[in-house]
Amino acid sequence: MKKQLFILGTIAAIALSGCSTNTKDTNNSSMGNMGSMNHEGMHHSGSGQVPQGLQTAANPKYKVGSQATIKADHMAGMNGAKATIVGAYDTTVYAVSYTPTTGGEKVKNHKWIVQEELEHAGDQPLKPGTEVTLKADHMEGMNGAKATIDSAEKATVYMVDYTATDGQKVKNHQWVTESELVK
């Protein structure tokens, strides 16, 4: 009888151990479907360093230190989050599609890469369809990846600190465009 109870208890313990929840799991599988972008490996917070040659905006709508609400869904918890402006820069900003250097699925329509994060891009805007090499590390496998420009626009881009709607604190997020912010 004791042996049967021991076996039954062991089986129950094994079965129940598969039901536990790891609350420290911070992978990006909870991000849901955000367009065709794959956000696995996304570097939510950045170092705060800006690419060489990126020019500070002369007269940005949102000044450094001011607050705005993000109206973009590059990442889970971003849309509707309150942000503090850390930097404002005038440049050409691109949405790109690329295959990570680490392998895996092609990332489509990644927003945003700035002109200064493209290898040998020069200072003139590039046209959609142009093949480029990325010098950014917003996501794993991005730096050095071959990419195709999906769209391009002259814009003021912002580096922001914000608390995601799920409570995660994000520092120095690169990049949010002026059109993706509201007061």
Task: Report each predicted region and the residues it spans.
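Membrane engagement elements in two modes
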Residues: 10, 24-25
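Long, charged/polar, surface-exposed segments that mediate recognition or autoinhibition
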Residues: 119-130
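C-terminal motif of bacterial Sec signal peptides marking the signal peptidase cleavage site
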Residues: 15-18
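Sec-dependent N-terminal signal peptides
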Residues: 6-13
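Bacterial signal peptide processing site
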Residues: 20-22
